């Protein structure tokens, strides 16, 4: 079986690692530029960027299954193109991908189908948005409606900051076209929870929960990033919280998908906020989270490819996904200066100490390139250092122990992944 995985992050490395465990897979193509093909058996790196190039490659190579990790390509309609050519692809069609591609569209969908979420208003006119600032309380959340690599959300503490943010997004175009429409949203103070799930548009099966760490600096301070680390499962995802999530968010979402006849097969990532004992939906992502995937998939006992095939066959109602009774911690090692300005091309040492196929200590490549059997930095987020242990405390300790075994110039990582929620000494 030939599998094509599209996307360049640590998420795609984790997907490839998990898929490669299925004995039916004899070839994996990585449309990435990421060097993870060097550490996964029968994996070939191919340099393809556009959906048309990827489609033509899949036709030429007779690829059996394509898995898309990149949100940009999903919103661009890559799934629709594959389906028009009778090729099997795992991911949402263009219509469903808009639940991530447009926060304004997603919020309207939530409101229409009774998904519990924060109060909001959407604006395409900056002057109307500025007038609205006089009618609300602070802090307030301002979101660029379009795709902004996980960085298009600002918490404005007062009116002055809010107006500056609107100017940045709508006039200065700091997020390009993503900021043409903005969502101004009620601020919810609480704990964020990430829940990945898989759907065939008939049922939604949640995965185990996770806790992302979005900010660049300790204690959740500094600039937004794509994510600096993850723990799974999330200690705050109790049975009561899970029941409220299913009743007030998951079930209404499924109702909306059916009512809108979206009819897709793929991942739904629920970004949740627990505030005052209630569970709210902050956002949908319509693909695996990064870095959540890197912590969640190693805890999946079930064969991921079989789970995907069940979804493609509209048979999710007849399967159960099994999970390890363990915990995972993922620490992101980034290039110094990320998420603003950073160097590329620095040699990475210490990777030879780890074999992700034979150990509960795993290294997933993100911004990594290979030259002459040596690995170099090639992006902002460079590596995902993951440890799986019987307790969260041990997983955190082991992950940081492993981080110290790896080195590259000006490497940076947060020192408190998981420790805001679990007291750990390391």
From Swiss-Prot:
Q: Which GO terms describe its biological process?
A: 'de novo' IMP biosynthetic process; purine nucleobase biosynthetic process
Enumerate the residues binding Mg(2+). 283, 285
Q: In which pathway does it act?
A: Purine metabolism; IMP biosynthesis via de novo pathway; N(1)-(5-phospho-D-ribosyl)glycinamide from 5-phospho-alpha-D-ribose 1-diphosphate: step 2/2
Instruction: Return the InterPro entries for the record.
Output: ATP-grasp, ATP_grasp_subdomain_1, PreATP-grasp_dom_sf, PRibGlycinamid_synth_ATP-grasp, PRibGlycinamide_synth, PRibGlycinamide_synth_C-dom, PRibGlycinamide_synth_C_sf, PRibGlycinamide_synth_N
Which Enzyme Commission number(s) are on file for it? 6.3.4.13
**Binding residues for ATP:** 133-194
Domain ATP-grasp: start-end pairs:
107-313
> What are the required cofactors?
Mg(2+); Mn(2+)
Which domain of life, per UniProt?
Answer: Bacteria
- Tell me the GO molecular function terms: ATP binding; metal ion binding; phosphoribosylamine-glycine ligase activity
Enumerate the UniProt keywords alphabetically.
ATP-binding, Ligase, Magnesium, Manganese, Metal-binding, Nucleotide-binding, Purine biosynthesis
Kindly state which reaction or reactions the protein catalyses: 5-phospho-beta-D-ribosylamine + glycine + ATP = N(1)-(5-phospho-beta-D-ribosyl)glycinamide + ADP + phosphate + H(+)
Task: Explain how, and how many, cofactor molecules are bound.
Answer: Binds 1 Mg(2+) or Mn(2+) ion per subunit.
**PANTHER family named among the record's database cross-references:** PHOSPHORIBOSYLAMINE--GLYCINE LIGASE, PHOSPHORIBOSYLAMINE--GLYCINE LIGASE, CHLOROPLASTIC
Q: Which family does it belong to?
A: Belongs to the GARS family.
Q: What is this protein called?
A: Phosphoribosylamine--glycine ligase
Gene from which this protein is expressed: purD
